[in-house]
UniProtKB/Swiss-Prot annotation:
Gene3D superfamilies: Mur ligase, C-terminal domain, Mur-like, catalytic domain, NAD(P)-binding Rossmann-like Domain
Binding site for ATP: G118, S119, N120, G121, K122, T123, T124
Catalyzed chemical reaction(s): UDP-N-acetyl-alpha-D-muramoyl-L-alanine + D-glutamate + ATP = UDP-N-acetyl-alpha-D-muramoyl-L-alanyl-D-glutamate + ADP + phosphate + H(+)
GO molecular function annotation: ATP binding; UDP-N-acetylmuramoylalanine-D-glutamate ligase activity
Full protein name: UDP-N-acetylmuramoylalanine--D-glutamate ligase
A Pfam family recorded for this sequence: Mur_ligase_C
Main subcellular location of this protein, as a coarse class: cytoplasm
Pathways involved: Cell wall biogenesis; peptidoglycan biosynthesis
Designated gene of the protein: murD
Length: 449
């Protein structure tokens, strides 16, 4: 789409989160006649609310489907709002195009576009790519699912800049025309089926990242993924692959080194990130960085110092020769399996959270290095049962704040303390970030007392 597609058009923005505000502001700059609808009243003291009112934007404090009619040209939907919402269904019935704020923003951008999607590892890999480009002296702005709406940053970019996007499957559904210069799919598992209904729908949403790429553009894929062949066969882009288990790709871990086109970048022991999943993230990031012209010294500089993204198997600190990690983002069993397998030393594991009917016994094979278990949250009793089945000592406490001092007491020099819940946080916290922050604060208070 072009920016001119929105000029003098009637556009409804559905959702008053940060992305909705950014979309409404950008649309006013593009000359659209904007209406914002929200499932609740607006805060009259909100600065964005006041500025949009001054710009003749209509703001309606209800998401009733009756607010939408055939006079609208576009519906801009918050990615988290499901397509079965009555207002969205009405837009479909009226054949009104349903977009996300990312589509509007990209219509105004003419520089290099790198887009990252996948089930796991998106944020860590995107952050690695960003830091590598910056270390190489390139001007790069990161936005999208990583926390910053694209509409907030796009007006400040020029043709010489790189826009690096992390994109969820929800966002990709509202991006009918995206055409990245470099696209990366980290991996695909069966996630968000409550939203997409089937795995096929979820995979199709991910495929949108490459659907309109051409032969001058690149698609980077995980060679170990079950959907890789489908993507390779259906894309028009040039495909590059990476693999943690195979070494015949341009970027590889080989003989104790990270190599790029058979040249040593650095010894693996000098890389700060831990875990097999982070090896995949590194391989993906280096493949993209190399395509983007990043030098080996810049790649090496980042990998020597990058310790991870907050709440994602994040190394916190070492105290009393015990290493502490915050993996609060591990909201599913697969993520915690990966975290537990990242350490070959005695581990104090803190697990549990929202009850969703998951089969936690799948974690049994991953407990071999676990020294003791601390169970929290709604699934506390399931964690206790799991630990006892594995023959591990287990202590049940109410929450991560109480788990932290227990973990400190249980740990000995050479151990790892790992918060990796394997469950969502909403039984006790508003987000995985709040859960992780509270854990870290309790750890620091305990260690400093």
């Amino acid at each position: 789409m072009q920016a001119t597609d929105f000029k003098n058009k009637k556009v409804m923005v559905f959702g008053w989160a940060r992305s909705g505000k950014a979309a409404a502001q950008l649309l006013t700059k593009l000359g659209s006649k904007v209406t914002v609808v929200n499932g609740g009243e607006f805060d009259a003291q909100d600065a964005t609310y006041r500025s949009l009112l001054a710009a003749d934007v209509t703001l309606i404090g209800t998401d009733n489907a009756e607010t939408l009619d055939s006079t609208y040209d576009y519906l801009i939907k918050n990615p988290g709002i499901n397509y079965d919402h009555p207002l969205v269904q009405k837009a479909e019935k009226l054949n009104i195009p349903i977009l996300t704020e990312v589509e509007i923003a990209l219509s105004t951008f003419n520089g290099r576009l790198i887009a990252v999607t996948g089930s796991n590892g998106k944020t860590t890999t995107t952050s690695l790519i960003r830091d590598m480009l910056k270390a190489d002296g390139q001007n790069v702005i990161t936005a999208g699912n990583i926390g910053v709406p694209v509409s907030e940053v796009v007006f400040d970019l020029t043709r010489e800049d790189t826009l690096l996007l992390e994109l969820s499957s929800f966002q990709l559904l509202g991006l009918p025309d995206i055409q990245p210069d470099i696209a990366l799919v980290t991996n695909i598992f069966s996630n968000h089926l409550d939203y997409h209904k089937t795995r096929a729908n979820y995979v199709a949403a991910k495929f949108r990242i490459t659907r309109h790429q051409n032969a001058n553009q690149y698609l980077v894929l995980n060679a170990d993924g079950q959907d890789t062949e489908k993507f390779k066969n259906e894309t028009e882009a040039q495909v590059l692959e990476f693999s943690r288990t195979k070494q015949h790709f341009p970027v590889a871990f080989s003989n104790g080194n990270l190599t790029l086109t058979d040249e040593i970048v650095m010894p693996t022991k000098d890389i700060k990130l831990v875990g097999p999943h982070n090896q995949e993230n590194i391989l993906a990031a280096v493949t993209v960085a190399n395509l983007a012209g990043v030098s080996k010294p810049a790649i090496r500089e980042v990998l020597k110092t990058f310790s991870g993204v907050a709440h994602r198997l994040q190394y916190l600190f070492t105290a009393g020769d015990v290493k502490y990690y915050n993996d609060s983002k591990a909201t599913d069993i697969e993520a915690t399996q990966t975290a537990l397998d990242s350490f070959d030393c005695p581990t104090i594991w803190i697990g549990g959270g929202l009850e969703r009917g998951d089969d936690l016994e799948r974690l049994l094979p991953n407990l071999k290095n676990v020294k003791a278990v601390i169970a929290v949250g709604e699934t506390q009793q399931k964690i206790v049962t799991l630990a006892r089945e594995a023959g591990k000592p287990v202590i049940a406490v109410t929450d991560v704040e109480h788990a932290a001092p227990v973990a400190v007491q249980l740990a000995s020099p050479g151990d790892v303390v790992l918060l990796s819940p394997a469950q969502a946080s909403w039984d006790q916290y508003s987000s995985f970030e709040e859960r992780g922050d509270n854990f870290v604060a309790s750890l620091k208070e305990t260690l400093n007392s």
